[in-house]
């Protein structure tokens, strides 16, 4: 979500949040949110800077992937929060360094994110 003003981004977030709540069937929605305000682009000819409010909402199906609970070789201590959902994967155990791969990260994203069907239901509501 992007808006040149604070009120606009709040209104859009509230609108989307109401729609998001409906796909979780009266349970608290599992979401990660990152928001920021600041320089988005610079006019290279020396003109005005463009500043805007921004927000990304990551819709979740569950808090932790199965590998978080697994033991032995299948265990991987990853519990995606906002850093991981934004593409930064801090590895807290040395033993997990050799286990993490692009394929495993993709699998974790798919496991903890909403399914295609749930996303379609949400986009149908907001169209």
Whereabouts are the PLM-identified features?
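HIT superfamily nucleotide-processing domains
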Residues: 1-127
